Amino acid sequence: AVFYDKNDKENFRLSLVTQGYDYNLNKPAFSNPRRFSFTLGENAKIKTAKEQLQKFINTKDKSLNTLQEAFSVEPVTKEFYAKYKGLYENLSQKLSANHVALNVLNGYEGLSETKAINAFVKKLLGRIVFLYFLQKKGWLGVPKDMPYGSGDKGFLYTTFQKSKEKNVSFYATYLCPLFFESLNTKHENDYSSLFESKIPFLNGGLFEAFTKQINGRKENMESSPFICEVLDNSDFEAIFDVFESYNFTIEESTPDNTEIGIDPEMLGKVFENLIDYKSKQGLFTRHEKLCILCVKMPSRALYKSDTPPHR
């Protein structure tokens, strides 16, 4: 089935809707139309939809199972993780092979040598992915007199294209200033003269720079000329080749709602595979478990109180 919003003429949702029977209500029941769906439209990323639906078209076994597989998010998760891991390994190897980069980033997150490089690359990619979700909300590149939500939803790639046109380093000229001088620095009305638009101030720590004392001055090691020289535009071309192929959705999948794309929960799964949680004494809690906790904990609290619980 196809669903659309009359106020949004550019996008629509292609959903797999199944019919069952509700014996309690004694009537037919239909699945949530948002469950197992592709978001398509003029500016949508269609690579995943095209590949998975084409696979179903080509198969000789036309059945409900193969149709459900075409609308499954699992292949996207595995494919994205494999490509994301490839980006991580390539950048880590490139930086680790450079002795100056090893020295500059030594001490990153309290780590040394290659472990420090790995931590830097994880955070670099994590920051970029986070900004993909942020730009999807229209919070980047917002015109000066417009509200948040009206920004450029392709802000990062647009900026990267600008760096290529000007033949300048994307990392040095745009990405580092975006990280450390815009997102991590408060400006009047959030306006950035470099980007000629509003950029939100985020003080959660994700965009804090790794610094060292050099000749009595605090220097940002992440924007060091040595790191800027190693990370050239070809590295970011590879990153955007991957990220621009997928639909980033700001809605997390739930047991009843699975949009075929990259969502915050999937990002958690990616980091779970890349990061050694045991050594860091951390744990990624999956969305379905959070849903259960949100239901069970209030019920338990009410049960223990003097007031009897109500449904």
Each model region followed by its residue ranges:
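Preference for the N-terminal adenyl/adenosyl cofactor-binding alpha/beta module
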Residues: 1-311
